């Protein structure tokens, strides 16, 4: 019996051990802000849940709420740009795109003390010329893989259900801090996915976790493990 126990102990050392499951990760992103009291409520909810998100801020909205842009950055969220005027880059000349990006960068710098790290083109619209411009501006382009169209669907239950149905490890979730229903849905989604073991990362963190290099002038929409 003693020899048998010793043999089993030796086998236990030699056999491969199971590894703890890697955390499932997603990135929550918000476009078109800041938006006054709605963004304040969202930031309060994110802080209470220990979640950092990525905000793609519009320059003209930073003009209205510079203190909120500063708060977003100060609380550890990632700040990308959504352009200055929310005009579609594909309908603009190269010079116009350059001016728009420059203005958006200047406004974010003035409000937060830091330059944008990422770009989400308005409407998600881009072409080869736009990618060339973003490369010159040193901005990777970030799209999304889950879109509940919360800017159009003002129903927190429907928005929440859509996201929970489609979210998977590596998803980049598109939302807007423009309506009460969107903010409500975002906080519900966090609660539900955290209960399922998901971890919320910024876009840059999610890309790094997946081993993806964010490249200026290149567009990415998700970062599966």
Model-derived segments and spans:
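Hydrophobic core
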Residues: 9-13
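Cleavable N-terminal signal peptides
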Residues: 7, 17-19
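Positively charged n-region of N-terminal signal peptides that target proteins for export
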Residues: 1-4
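Alpha-helical scaffold elements lining the catalytic groove of polysaccharide deacetylases
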Residues: 38-41, 87-115, 123-169, 182-188
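C-terminal domain-boundary segment and adjacent tail
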Residues: 48-49, 63, 181-225
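Active-site beta-loop-alpha junctions enriched in small/polar residues
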Residues: 33, 58-60, 84, 122-124, ...
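Active-site beta->alpha N-cap acidic-glycine motif
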Residues: 19-92, 96-110, 116, 192, ...
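Structural recognition of the beta-strand scaffold that forms the well-ordered cores
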Residues: 26-29, 53-57, 78-81, 117-121, ...
């Amino acid at each position: 019996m003693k020899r048998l126990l010793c043999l089993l102990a030796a086998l236990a050392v030699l056999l491969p051990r199971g590894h703890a499951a890697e955390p499932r990760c997603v990135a929550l992103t918000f476009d078109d802000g800041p938006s006054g009291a709605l963004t304040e409520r969202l930031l309060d909810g994110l802080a209470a849940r220990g979640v950092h998100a990525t905000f793609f801020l519009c320059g003209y909205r930073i003009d209205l709420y510079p203190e909120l842009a500063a708060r977003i950055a100060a609380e550890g969220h990632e700040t990308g740009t959504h352009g200055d005027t929310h005009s579609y880059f594909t309908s603009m000349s190269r010079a116009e795109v350059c001016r728009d990006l420059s203005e958006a960068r200047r406004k974010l710098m003035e409000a937060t003390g830091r330059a944008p790290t990422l770009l989400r083109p308005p409407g998600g619209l881009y072409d080869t010329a736009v990618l060339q411009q973003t490369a010159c501006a040193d901005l990777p382009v970030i799209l999304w893989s889950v879109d509940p169209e919360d800017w159009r669907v003002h129903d927190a239950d429907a928005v929440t259900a859509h996201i929970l149905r489609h979210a998977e490890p590596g998803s980049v979730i598109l939302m807007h801090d423009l309506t009460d229903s969107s903010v409500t849905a975002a906080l519900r989604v966090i609660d539900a996915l955290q209960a399922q073991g998901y971890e919320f990362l910024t876009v840059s963190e999610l890309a790094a976790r997946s081993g993806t290099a964010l490249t200026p002038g290149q567009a990415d929409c998700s970062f599966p493990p």
